[in-house]
Amino acid sequence: MALSTKVPHLMTLADLTPGQIQRIITHSYHLKRTAQPWLAPQGRAGSGGKYSNAPHKLRMPSQSLFSKSIALLFSKRSTRTRLSAETAALLLGGQALFLGREDIQLGVNETVPDSARVIGGMCQGIFARVGDHSEIEELARYSPVPVLNALSSLWHPTQVLADILTLHEHAALFDPASASPTPSAADAFSQKYTKLGEVRPLTVAYVGDSANVLHDMLVTYPRLGHQLRVASPENDKYRAPKAVWDRVVELGCDKNIFWTADPRAAVKGADLVVTDTWISMGQEAEKAQRLKDFAGYQVTEALCREGGANPDWKFMHCLPRKQDEVDDEVFYGPRSLVFQESDNRKWTIMALFDLLFGKWSLLARNGEGADAGSE
Protein backbone atom coordinates (compact mmCIF):
# COMPACT_ATOMS: atom_id res chain seq x y z
CA MET A 1 0.00 0.00 0.00
CA ALA A 2 1.12 3.59 -0.59
CA LEU A 3 2.51 5.23 2.51
CA SER A 4 0.98 8.38 3.88
CA THR A 5 2.92 11.53 3.12
CA LYS A 6 2.26 12.66 6.69
CA VAL A 7 4.24 10.75 9.31
CA PRO A 8 1.84 9.29 11.91
CA HIS A 9 2.79 9.54 15.59
CA LEU A 10 0.93 8.43 18.72
CA MET A 11 1.45 10.39 21.94
CA THR A 12 -1.78 9.62 23.83
CA LEU A 13 -5.08 7.81 23.33
CA ALA A 14 -6.68 11.27 23.23
CA ASP A 15 -5.32 11.40 19.67
CA LEU A 16 -7.49 8.44 18.63
CA THR A 17 -11.20 8.03 18.02
CA PRO A 18 -13.11 5.34 19.95
CA GLY A 19 -13.25 3.37 16.69
CA GLN A 20 -9.48 3.50 16.27
CA ILE A 21 -9.01 2.37 19.87
CA GLN A 22 -11.37 -0.55 19.31
CA ARG A 23 -9.52 -1.42 16.11
CA ILE A 24 -6.26 -1.71 18.07
CA ILE A 25 -7.92 -3.90 20.70
CA THR A 26 -9.43 -6.23 18.08
CA HIS A 27 -6.12 -6.43 16.22
CA SER A 28 -4.26 -7.14 19.49
CA TYR A 29 -6.56 -10.06 20.23
CA HIS A 30 -6.14 -11.37 16.69
CA LEU A 31 -2.34 -11.22 16.90
CA LYS A 32 -2.40 -12.87 20.31
CA ARG A 33 -4.42 -15.82 19.00
CA THR A 34 -2.32 -16.26 15.86
CA ALA A 35 1.07 -15.80 17.53
CA GLN A 36 0.64 -17.85 20.69
CA PRO A 37 0.71 -21.25 18.93
CA TRP A 38 4.14 -20.34 17.54
CA LEU A 39 5.42 -19.80 21.06
CA ALA A 40 4.34 -23.22 22.33
CA PRO A 41 6.56 -26.31 22.00
CA GLN A 42 5.82 -27.99 18.67
CA GLY A 43 3.42 -30.86 18.97
CA ARG A 44 2.38 -30.00 22.51
CA ALA A 45 -1.28 -29.49 21.71
CA GLY A 46 -3.11 -32.72 20.93
CA SER A 47 -0.03 -34.94 21.16
CA GLY A 48 -0.48 -36.26 24.65
CA GLY A 49 2.15 -33.87 25.96
CA LYS A 50 4.86 -35.28 23.70
CA TYR A 51 7.12 -32.98 21.73
CA SER A 52 7.37 -33.17 17.96
CA ASN A 53 10.00 -32.01 15.50
CA ALA A 54 7.39 -31.57 12.79
CA PRO A 55 7.41 -28.06 11.33
CA HIS A 56 4.60 -25.73 12.25
CA LYS A 57 1.66 -25.98 9.88
CA LEU A 58 0.26 -22.68 11.08
CA ARG A 59 0.42 -19.35 9.34
CA MET A 60 2.84 -16.87 10.81
CA PRO A 61 1.45 -13.66 12.28
CA SER A 62 1.77 -10.51 10.18
CA GLN A 63 5.39 -9.98 9.11
CA SER A 64 4.98 -6.25 8.51
CA LEU A 65 8.33 -5.50 10.18
CA PHE A 66 10.32 -7.94 8.03
CA SER A 67 13.81 -6.46 7.51
CA LYS A 68 12.83 -3.40 9.56
CA SER A 69 14.43 -2.04 12.72
CA ILE A 70 12.63 -0.32 15.58
CA ALA A 71 14.59 1.95 17.92
CA LEU A 72 13.69 1.57 21.59
CA LEU A 73 14.76 4.94 22.97
CA PHE A 74 14.49 4.51 26.75
CA SER A 75 15.73 7.15 29.17
CA LYS A 76 13.94 5.38 32.05
CA ARG A 77 14.25 1.84 33.42
CA SER A 78 11.78 -0.69 32.09
CA THR A 79 10.85 -4.36 32.48
CA ARG A 80 7.43 -4.97 30.92
CA THR A 81 7.61 -2.30 28.22
CA ARG A 82 11.05 -3.34 27.00
CA LEU A 83 10.26 -7.08 27.02
CA SER A 84 6.95 -6.46 25.27
CA ALA A 85 8.57 -4.32 22.58
CA GLU A 86 11.49 -6.63 21.86
CA THR A 87 9.38 -9.79 21.65
CA ALA A 88 6.65 -8.03 19.64
CA ALA A 89 9.13 -6.78 17.04
CA LEU A 90 10.59 -10.28 16.72
CA LEU A 91 7.18 -11.88 16.15
CA LEU A 92 6.47 -9.32 13.42
CA GLY A 93 9.70 -10.25 11.66
CA GLY A 94 11.68 -7.19 12.71
CA GLN A 95 14.42 -6.24 15.12
CA ALA A 96 14.25 -3.98 18.16
CA LEU A 97 17.40 -1.97 18.93
CA PHE A 98 17.60 -0.87 22.56
CA LEU A 99 19.16 2.53 23.23
CA GLY A 100 19.26 3.16 26.97
CA ARG A 101 20.17 6.17 29.04
CA GLU A 102 23.88 5.34 28.83
CA ASP A 103 23.76 4.84 25.06
CA ILE A 104 22.12 8.09 24.07
CA GLN A 105 21.15 11.21 26.01
CA LEU A 106 18.55 13.29 24.23
CA GLY A 107 19.57 16.91 24.12
CA VAL A 108 22.87 16.33 25.98
CA ASN A 109 25.54 15.09 23.57
CA GLU A 110 23.37 15.85 20.55
CA THR A 111 20.28 17.95 20.03
CA VAL A 112 16.91 16.19 19.95
CA PRO A 113 16.23 17.29 16.33
CA ASP A 114 19.57 15.85 15.21
CA SER A 115 19.03 12.60 17.13
CA ALA A 116 15.54 12.26 15.65
CA ARG A 117 16.86 12.63 12.10
CA VAL A 118 19.76 10.22 12.65
CA ILE A 119 17.67 7.51 14.30
CA GLY A 120 14.83 7.98 11.82
CA GLY A 121 17.27 7.60 8.95
CA MET A 122 18.38 4.17 10.15
CA CYS A 123 15.21 2.77 11.74
CA GLN A 124 11.61 2.50 10.61
CA GLY A 125 10.02 3.44 13.93
CA ILE A 126 10.86 4.95 17.32
CA PHE A 127 9.36 3.66 20.58
CA ALA A 128 10.37 6.25 23.19
CA ARG A 129 10.19 6.11 26.98
CA VAL A 130 11.16 9.55 28.22
CA GLY A 131 10.98 11.91 31.18
CA ASP A 132 9.25 15.18 30.41
CA HIS A 133 6.57 14.92 27.74
CA SER A 134 8.13 17.79 25.81
CA GLU A 135 11.03 15.46 24.92
CA ILE A 136 8.88 13.05 22.94
CA GLU A 137 6.93 15.89 21.33
CA GLU A 138 10.18 17.38 20.04
CA LEU A 139 11.35 13.94 18.92
CA ALA A 140 8.16 13.45 16.91
CA ARG A 141 8.38 16.95 15.44
CA TYR A 142 11.66 16.15 13.68
CA SER A 143 11.44 12.38 13.14
CA PRO A 144 10.97 11.16 9.54
CA VAL A 145 9.45 7.92 10.90
CA PRO A 146 6.55 7.23 13.29
CA VAL A 147 7.14 7.85 17.01
CA LEU A 148 5.14 5.90 19.60
CA ASN A 149 4.98 7.00 23.23
CA ALA A 150 6.19 4.17 25.49
CA LEU A 151 5.78 6.45 28.55
CA SER A 152 6.19 10.12 29.32
CA SER A 153 5.48 12.39 32.27
CA LEU A 154 1.95 13.03 30.97
CA TRP A 155 0.77 9.92 29.13
CA HIS A 156 1.06 6.12 29.03
CA PRO A 157 -1.15 4.95 26.14
CA THR A 158 0.19 1.40 25.76
CA GLN A 159 -0.66 0.57 29.38
CA VAL A 160 -4.29 1.64 29.07
CA LEU A 161 -4.70 -0.31 25.83
CA ALA A 162 -3.52 -3.45 27.65
CA ASP A 163 -6.05 -2.74 30.40
CA ILE A 164 -8.87 -2.43 27.87
CA LEU A 165 -7.90 -5.68 26.10
CA THR A 166 -7.90 -7.42 29.49
CA LEU A 167 -11.39 -6.11 30.25
CA HIS A 168 -12.69 -7.42 26.92
CA GLU A 169 -11.11 -10.84 27.45
CA HIS A 170 -12.70 -11.03 30.90
CA ALA A 171 -16.01 -9.39 29.97
CA ALA A 172 -17.92 -12.36 31.41
CA LEU A 173 -16.65 -11.44 34.89
CA PHE A 174 -18.77 -8.30 34.67
CA ASP A 175 -21.65 -9.73 32.60
CA PRO A 176 -21.91 -13.50 31.86
CA ALA A 177 -23.81 -12.73 28.65
CA SER A 178 -20.80 -10.80 27.31
CA ALA A 179 -18.28 -13.64 27.22
CA SER A 180 -15.90 -13.70 24.28
CA PRO A 181 -16.72 -16.65 22.01
CA THR A 182 -14.29 -19.53 22.27
CA PRO A 183 -12.90 -20.23 18.79
CA SER A 184 -12.65 -23.78 17.52
CA ALA A 185 -9.22 -25.38 17.29
CA ALA A 186 -9.20 -24.62 13.57
CA ASP A 187 -10.35 -21.03 13.97
CA ALA A 188 -7.91 -20.40 16.80
CA PHE A 189 -4.99 -20.96 14.42
CA SER A 190 -6.50 -19.18 11.43
CA GLN A 191 -6.21 -15.59 10.30
CA LYS A 192 -9.95 -15.13 10.87
CA TYR A 193 -10.92 -12.40 13.30
CA THR A 194 -12.93 -13.48 16.33
CA LYS A 195 -15.31 -10.99 17.91
CA LEU A 196 -14.31 -9.99 21.42
CA GLY A 197 -16.80 -9.92 24.26
CA GLU A 198 -18.55 -6.58 24.64
CA VAL A 199 -17.75 -4.89 27.94
CA ARG A 200 -20.87 -3.41 29.52
CA PRO A 201 -20.59 0.15 30.87
CA LEU A 202 -18.48 -0.10 34.01
CA THR A 203 -17.86 2.03 37.06
CA VAL A 204 -14.07 2.27 37.28
CA ALA A 205 -12.46 3.57 40.47
CA TYR A 206 -8.91 4.87 40.49
CA VAL A 207 -7.33 5.30 43.92
CA GLY A 208 -3.96 7.05 44.08
CA ASP A 209 -1.71 9.56 42.36
CA SER A 210 -2.77 11.39 39.21
CA ALA A 211 0.01 10.17 36.94
CA ASN A 212 0.43 9.17 33.30
CA VAL A 213 -1.67 5.98 33.46
CA LEU A 214 -4.64 7.80 34.96
CA HIS A 215 -4.27 10.61 32.43
CA ASP A 216 -4.83 8.23 29.51
CA MET A 217 -7.70 6.63 31.42
CA LEU A 218 -9.32 10.07 31.79
CA VAL A 219 -9.39 10.67 28.02
CA THR A 220 -10.37 7.10 27.12
CA TYR A 221 -12.71 5.33 29.53
CA PRO A 222 -15.55 7.90 29.39
CA ARG A 223 -15.50 7.78 25.57
CA LEU A 224 -15.93 3.99 25.76
CA GLY A 225 -19.02 4.38 27.94
CA HIS A 226 -17.49 3.91 31.39
CA GLN A 227 -17.76 6.12 34.47
CA LEU A 228 -14.47 7.04 36.14
CA ARG A 229 -14.31 7.80 39.88
CA VAL A 230 -10.96 9.12 41.08
CA ALA A 231 -9.61 9.52 44.62
CA SER A 232 -6.44 11.53 45.20
CA PRO A 233 -5.27 13.88 47.98
CA GLU A 234 -6.41 17.50 47.88
CA ASN A 235 -3.15 18.84 46.54
CA ASP A 236 -2.61 20.18 43.04
CA LYS A 237 0.42 17.95 42.48
CA TYR A 238 -1.84 14.90 42.87
CA ARG A 239 -4.44 16.16 40.40
CA ALA A 240 -4.40 16.15 36.59
CA PRO A 241 -2.29 19.02 35.19
CA LYS A 242 -3.93 21.64 32.99
CA ALA A 243 -2.51 20.17 29.76
CA VAL A 244 -4.26 16.87 30.53
CA TRP A 245 -7.50 18.34 31.84
CA ASP A 246 -7.81 20.53 28.75
CA ARG A 247 -7.84 17.37 26.61
CA VAL A 248 -10.38 15.78 28.99
CA VAL A 249 -12.74 18.74 28.55
CA GLU A 250 -12.07 19.00 24.81
CA LEU A 251 -13.21 15.37 24.38
CA GLY A 252 -16.24 15.80 26.65
CA CYS A 253 -14.93 13.21 29.10
CA ASP A 254 -15.30 15.44 32.18
CA LYS A 255 -19.04 14.71 32.31
CA ASN A 256 -18.31 11.09 33.27
CA ILE A 257 -15.56 11.75 35.82
CA PHE A 258 -16.09 12.11 39.58
CA TRP A 259 -13.15 13.37 41.65
CA THR A 260 -12.81 13.14 45.44
CA ALA A 261 -10.20 13.01 48.19
CA ASP A 262 -12.03 10.12 49.88
CA PRO A 263 -11.06 6.67 48.53
CA ARG A 264 -14.21 5.14 50.02
CA ALA A 265 -16.38 7.56 48.08
CA ALA A 266 -14.44 6.75 44.90
CA VAL A 267 -15.03 2.99 45.09
CA LYS A 268 -18.80 3.31 45.57
CA GLY A 269 -20.43 0.98 43.05
CA ALA A 270 -17.07 0.17 41.46
CA ASP A 271 -16.80 -2.82 39.13
CA LEU A 272 -13.07 -2.29 38.70
CA VAL A 273 -10.57 -0.73 41.13
CA VAL A 274 -7.25 0.53 39.76
CA THR A 275 -4.18 1.96 41.43
CA ASP A 276 -0.62 2.81 40.46
CA THR A 277 2.68 3.52 42.14
CA TRP A 278 2.65 6.43 44.58
CA ILE A 279 6.32 7.16 43.98
CA SER A 280 7.34 7.29 40.32
CA MET A 281 10.90 7.28 39.01
CA GLY A 282 12.48 10.62 39.89
CA GLN A 283 10.24 11.18 42.93
CA GLU A 284 12.32 9.19 45.42
CA ALA A 285 13.19 12.32 47.42
CA GLU A 286 9.46 12.86 48.04
CA LYS A 287 8.88 9.35 49.42
CA ALA A 288 8.29 10.26 53.08
CA GLN A 289 5.84 13.05 52.25
CA ARG A 290 4.01 10.98 49.65
CA LEU A 291 3.55 8.04 52.01
CA LYS A 292 2.08 10.48 54.53
CA ASP A 293 -0.21 12.10 51.96
CA PHE A 294 -1.51 8.73 50.70
CA ALA A 295 -2.19 7.26 54.14
CA GLY A 296 -5.55 5.49 53.94
CA TYR A 297 -5.37 5.00 50.17
CA GLN A 298 -4.21 1.37 50.21
CA VAL A 299 -6.61 -0.82 48.23
CA THR A 300 -7.95 -3.53 50.54
CA GLU A 301 -11.03 -5.70 50.87
CA ALA A 302 -12.09 -3.58 53.85
CA LEU A 303 -11.81 -0.27 51.99
CA CYS A 304 -13.90 -1.53 49.08
CA ARG A 305 -16.48 -3.18 51.34
CA GLU A 306 -16.87 -0.04 53.45
CA GLY A 307 -17.05 2.13 50.34
CA GLY A 308 -19.75 0.00 48.74
CA ALA A 309 -17.92 -1.44 45.73
CA ASN A 310 -19.70 -4.01 43.59
CA PRO A 311 -19.41 -7.37 45.44
CA ASP A 312 -17.65 -8.87 42.39
CA TRP A 313 -15.21 -5.98 41.85
CA LYS A 314 -11.89 -6.71 40.12
CA PHE A 315 -8.47 -5.12 40.53
CA MET A 316 -5.71 -3.81 38.22
CA HIS A 317 -2.24 -2.34 38.78
CA CYS A 318 0.25 -1.46 36.02
CA LEU A 319 3.29 -2.63 38.08
CA PRO A 320 5.75 -2.48 39.70
CA ARG A 321 3.71 -2.64 42.89
CA LYS A 322 4.52 -1.73 46.49
CA GLN A 323 2.51 -3.16 49.38
CA ASP A 324 1.59 0.34 50.56
CA GLU A 325 -0.57 0.71 47.43
CA VAL A 326 -2.49 -2.60 47.64
CA ASP A 327 -2.29 -5.44 50.14
CA ASP A 328 -1.40 -9.04 49.28
CA GLU A 329 -4.96 -10.30 49.76
CA VAL A 330 -6.19 -8.21 46.85
CA PHE A 331 -3.05 -8.22 44.71
CA TYR A 332 -2.62 -12.02 44.70
CA GLY A 333 -6.28 -12.90 45.22
CA PRO A 334 -9.06 -13.92 42.80
CA ARG A 335 -10.06 -10.31 42.18
CA SER A 336 -6.71 -9.48 40.61
CA LEU A 337 -6.27 -9.19 36.83
CA VAL A 338 -2.77 -7.77 37.27
CA PHE A 339 -0.75 -10.48 35.55
CA GLN A 340 -3.24 -10.99 32.71
CA GLU A 341 -3.02 -7.23 32.20
CA SER A 342 0.78 -7.40 32.23
CA ASP A 343 0.82 -10.19 29.63
CA ASN A 344 -1.40 -8.13 27.35
CA ARG A 345 1.18 -5.35 27.19
CA LYS A 346 2.96 -7.50 24.60
CA TRP A 347 -0.05 -7.95 22.33
CA THR A 348 -1.24 -4.35 22.34
CA ILE A 349 2.29 -3.11 21.65
CA MET A 350 2.57 -5.70 18.88
CA ALA A 351 -0.65 -4.37 17.33
CA LEU A 352 0.64 -0.80 17.50
CA PHE A 353 3.97 -1.80 15.95
CA ASP A 354 2.12 -3.59 13.14
CA LEU A 355 -0.35 -0.78 12.41
CA LEU A 356 1.88 2.23 13.09
CA PHE A 357 5.42 1.14 12.17
CA GLY A 358 4.69 -1.67 9.72
CA LYS A 359 1.74 -0.33 7.77
CA TRP A 360 1.39 3.35 8.69
CA SER A 361 -2.35 2.63 8.72
CA LEU A 362 -3.38 3.43 12.29
CA LEU A 363 -3.80 7.17 11.79
CA ALA A 364 -3.87 7.25 7.99
CA ARG A 365 -7.59 6.60 7.98
CA ASN A 366 -10.37 6.85 10.51
CA GLY A 367 -10.70 3.68 12.57
CA GLU A 368 -14.49 4.08 12.89
CA GLY A 369 -15.87 1.00 11.23
CA ALA A 370 -12.53 0.01 9.72
CA ASP A 371 -12.06 -3.69 9.17
CA ALA A 372 -8.80 -4.53 10.87
CA GLY A 373 -8.88 -7.89 9.18
CA SER A 374 -8.46 -6.29 5.79
CA GLU A 375 -4.95 -5.12 6.61
From Swiss-Prot:
Carbamoyl phosphate binds at S78, T79, R80, T81, R129, H156, Q159, C318, L319, R345. It holds the Pfam family OTCace_N. PANTHER family: ORNITHINE CARBAMOYLTRANSFERASE, MITOCHONDRIAL, ORNITHINE TRANSCARBAMYLASE, MITOCHONDRIAL. It comes from Trametes hirsuta (White-rot fungus). GO terms for molecular function: amino acid binding; ornithine carbamoyltransferase activity. Pathway: Amino-acid biosynthesis; L-arginine biosynthesis; L-arginine from L-ornithine and carbamoyl phosphate: step 1/3. Homotrimer. Its main location: mitochondrion. The keyword Transmembrane does not apply. It is found in: Mitochondrion matrix. It is an enzyme of class 2 (transferase). L-ornithine binds at N212, D276, S280, M281. This is Ornithine carbamoyltransferase, mitochondrial. One of its GO terms (cellular component) is mitochondrial matrix. The active site is at C318. Belongs to the aspartate/ornithine carbamoyltransferase superfamily. OTCase family.
